[in-house]
């Protein structure tokens, strides 16, 4: 078992979002869940991916936070295939990631890793009373919300509450009520919340912050699945089109700025998330 720490959605070490990557030998079985959870807890990253080669084109991946196994993690998947490319285990081409969220196509090229999201779906649109409850969990009121956008639960592999914010100053300075956010996440059966504001200068698509204390993540500096969900949300409002390549900036408040790309495939239904990752550490487990 080889252990790496990667910085995802960045081309520099100590930027982007860290993920643990454990590569199992081909003849090695997955350890028991408690062991994998303990590894994730010890590494202290928001997600750790355990990857096993099934054949030359198929890799099975399981994802663990310090508290739970989750179906999918975008930045950990980018980290897995960037690591496999760096170690020359794979070459540029198309691959399949077997995950609990389904089998996803991965495209590896020399610059970026592009991964399919699960087909997007809007799971819930909030009413006015629920919207007040959502913003109050971040000590915000409705004056700090755009008038023409409403929070929705969107899923492209994991369910998140997508929360529009009026401007970047508000996004940068909100104060989370942790217990309220946990209650919201339990009540609406979501992994977390993804807050965003559109870039008024139009250099980027949006600035984002991801808050998921229910699964042990107070804030995450890059999230592939959440920005996949945000891509679908923005397309539904005709803010972006299926022809655009979108750029999301996340992690600024944490000092780990990340750049996440998204686009629609030719079918105009499947969303792909793109980015790079670099290995910052290689570790060894003694047992």
Model-based region annotation:
Residues 1-72, 78-287:
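Active-site proximal loop and beta-alpha junction motif in alpha/beta enzyme cores
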